[in-house]
């Protein structure tokens, strides 16, 4: 499979997490390609039984498509762990490197890497690393945006975008850190959280990309 097709598969998977319906327009925007290019790729992927058309959701990954996406995430996240633990990369540097390397490493390399790293369960951003042959099921899947009550929470996963990681680094908020959700302002769609004695205003766009767990 070509790297381009692999990127399309990941894109469709990620849109399906964020939005109710996956459209050609949204795929084109995220992939930064023309709508005709998306149409052509969609035809190929449908013919290869990677995706199927769905009236409500736009497109759905087939079992084969989800299997391939899971393998890609496994490669990507193991590479991220290696870069942080063995090459002293920071968490905001690893995503782009892993994006390139995930398309080039062999299955044997990934197996050896997994063993070298001690079979890690999560990547530096808190994302689940599926075991060999298993489908990706995120362990940390409660977004801050869905929190309904004030209280103590722990940051368990973040989307690995440069802007989000830079925002968290600026405020010294990292995976595993605890913080207080003080209130939610429905008018401005903003959470007020207390982290390390600092009040932070977190808008809904950011809150959708931060995953948490309640601390009892």
Predicted feature locations:
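Short, hydrophobic-biased segments on the C-terminal half of alpha helices
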Residues: 42-43
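Basic, amphipathic "hinge/linker" alpha-helix immediately C-terminal to the N-terminal HTH DNA-binding motif
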Residues: 57-76
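Key DNA-contact positions within bacterial/archaeal DNA-binding proteins
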Residues: 36, 92
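Alpha-helical residues within the helix-turn-helix
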Residues: 29, 46-47
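Mid-protein regulatory/catalytic core that forms ligand/cofactor-binding pockets
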Residues: 102-209
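Short acidic, hydrophobic short linear motifs in intrinsically disordered regions
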Residues: 18-26
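A short, conserved structural fragment
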Residues: 47-54
């Amino acid at each position: 499979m070509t790297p381009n097709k692999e990127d399309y598969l990941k894109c469709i998977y990620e849109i399906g997490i964020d939005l109710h319906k996956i459209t050609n327009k949204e795929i084109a925007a995220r992939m930064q390609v023309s709508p005709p290019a998306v149409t052509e790729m969609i035809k190929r992927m449908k013919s290869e039984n990677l995706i199927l058309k769905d009236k409500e959701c736009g497109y759905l990954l087939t079992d084969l498509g989800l299997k391939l996406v899971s393998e890609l995430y496994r490669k990507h996240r193991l590479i991220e762990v290696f870069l942080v633990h063995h090459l002293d990369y920071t968490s905001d540097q690893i995503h782009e490197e892993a994006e390139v390397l995930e398309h080039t490493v062999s299955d044997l390399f990934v197996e050896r890497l997994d063993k070298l790293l001690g079979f890690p369960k999560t990547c530096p951003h808190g994302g689940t690393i599926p075991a060999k042959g298993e489908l990706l099921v995120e362990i940390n899947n409660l977004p801050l945006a869905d929190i309904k009550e004030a209280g103590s929470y722990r940051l368990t996963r973040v989307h690995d975008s440069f802007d989000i990681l830079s925002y968290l680094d600026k405020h010294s908020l990292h995976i595993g850190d605890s913080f207080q959700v003080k209130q939610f302002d429905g008018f401005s769609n903003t959470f007020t959280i207390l982290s390390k004695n600092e009040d932070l205003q977190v808008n809904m766009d950011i809150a959708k990309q931060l995953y948490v767990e309640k601390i009892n």
